């Protein structure tokens, strides 16, 4: 068997490098990493160097441009496109979008999926309804949520791709007297298992477990390959997302007529 060592870089490029150095001092068999890649840059050259010395490196979720390491990634574009299309199909036009800024590859792909779905439906979402900031910027996140919740006409749907959003969002909506999902239809990624409390949930395919197992299996394959590592492999999981309603719920009145597909679902 293997012993698993866990570390958290807190999105710090310097800390990530220090942690990797510390792990290498234990003569680790391989490195599984969600790499830092943003305003500070990335440790791309260092990760490539580690792999070149014979230590397998498998990147997960966040793809660094031009990296020469194995990677297992989620198709963030399709996921966000399908979530946005679901909202627009239900007839909602006054919507809000929350996500990480388009600095990392996932943020870029998600924003592109959102915009492409809106373009397909001929919908223009005003900039004041779009929040793009890292999860660490809790002050801006709170300000945005309280602003949209207290407008004369608040959004009828909020598409969220920011991690750890359950408590902050629900608190903002509740303080403004808004109900979920009767007044605001919440949807998106990483809902921290909040939505089932309101009678529905988001189904992710592949599941987090399936995705994690794929990354672990690739890592083991590389460890068992020894020093003769094959060319890096880039595995992309096409991700599908859709709401699953566990019971009959009342959603906000649509701004436009729902499409035929949504009418059949109901």
Task: Outline where the language-model segments fall.
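Flexible loop/turn connectors
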Residues: 145-265
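Alpha-helical recognition/docking segments in bacterial nutrient-uptake
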Residues: 1-85, 149-150
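Periplasmic-binding protein-like
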Residues: 23, 28-37, 96-98, 152-164, ...
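Short, solvent-exposed amphipathic alpha-helices that sit
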Residues: 1, 18, 79-83, 105-124, ...
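Hydrophobic alpha-helical segments within soluble ligand-binding/sensing domains
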Residues: 70-97, 112-116, 138-146, 166, ...
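Short beta-strand elements in bilobed, periplasmic/extracellular small-molecule ligand-binding domains
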Residues: 1-8, 97, 115-138
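An alpha-beta-alpha
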Residues: 81-121, 231-250
């Amino acid at each position: 068997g293997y012993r698993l060592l866990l570390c958290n870089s807190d999105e710090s490029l310097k800390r990530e490098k220090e942690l990797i150095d510390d792990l290498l001092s234990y003569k680790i068999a391989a490195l599984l990493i969600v790499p830092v890649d943003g305003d500070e840059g990335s440790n791309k050259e260092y990760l490539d160097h580690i792999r070149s010395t014979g230590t397998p490196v498998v990147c997960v979720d966040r793809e660094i441009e031009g990296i020469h390491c194995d990677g297992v990634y989620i198709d963030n574009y399709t996921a966000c496109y399908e979530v946005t299309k679901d909202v627009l199909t239900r007839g909602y036009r006054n919507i809000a979008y929350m996500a990480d800024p388009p600095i990392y590859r996932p943020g870029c792909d998600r924003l592109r999926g959102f915009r492409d779905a809106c373009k397909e439906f001929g919908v223009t979402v005003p900039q004041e309804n779009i929040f793009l900031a890292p999860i660490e910027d809790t002050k801006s996140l709170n300000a945005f949520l309280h602003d949209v919740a207290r407008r004369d006409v608040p959004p009828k749907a909020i598409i969220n791709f920011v991690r750890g959003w359950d408590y902050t969002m629900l608190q903002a909506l509740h303080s403004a007297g808004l109900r979920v999902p009767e007044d605001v239809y919440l949807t998106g990624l990483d809902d921290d298992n909040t939505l089932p409390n309101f009678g529905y949930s988001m189904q992710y395919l592949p599941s987090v477990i399936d995705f994690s197992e794929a990354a672990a299996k690739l890592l083991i394959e590389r460890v068992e390959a020894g020093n003769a590592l094959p060319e890096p492999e880039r595995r992309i999981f096409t991700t599908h997302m859709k709401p699953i309603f566990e019971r009959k719920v009342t959603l906000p009145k649509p701004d436009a007529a729902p499409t035929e597909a949504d009418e059949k679902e109901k």
